Curated annotation (Swiss-Prot):
Protein family: Belongs to the sulfur carrier protein TusA family.
Assembly behavior: Interacts with IscS.
Cellular component terms (Gene Ontology): cytoplasm
Upper lineage: Bacteria, Pseudomonadati, Pseudomonadota, Gammaproteobacteria, Enterobacterales
Entries under Gene3D superfamilies matching the protein: TusA-like domain
Range of residues in the leader sequence: none
Organism from which the protein derives: Buchnera aphidicola subsp. Acyrthosiphon pisum (strain APS)
UniProt-recorded name of the protein: Sulfur carrier protein TusA
Annotated gene: tusA
Gene Ontology process terms (BP): tRNA wobble position uridine thiolation
């Protein structure tokens, strides 16, 4: 069974968001999705890079207004 997760990281600053995202994704199955909410400006750079290097798919990002929203899918 696939599950979709919402991860509220508002108020956390680098490196905490990426550490929590990595731990959460580790427990997910391939193709499960996670919606991440954050207000840390560093996530605009860190999350796309994390997805690239860890081979996950960044499906959508909304970074014009806070909270920033990122939709990721585990795996490619």
């Amino acid at each position: 069974m696939k599950k979709n997760i919402i991860l509220n990281l508002i108020g956390l600053r680098c490196p905490e968001p990426i550490m929590i995202i990595r731990k959460t994704i580790r427990d997910m199955k391939d193709n499960e999705k996670i919606l991440i909410l954050s207000d840390d400006p560093a996530t605009k750079r860190d999350i796309p890079n994390f997805c690239y290097f860890m081979e996950h798919k960044l499906l959508k990002n909304e970074i014009k207004v806070k909270p920033y929203r990122y939709l990721l899918k585990k795996g490619l």
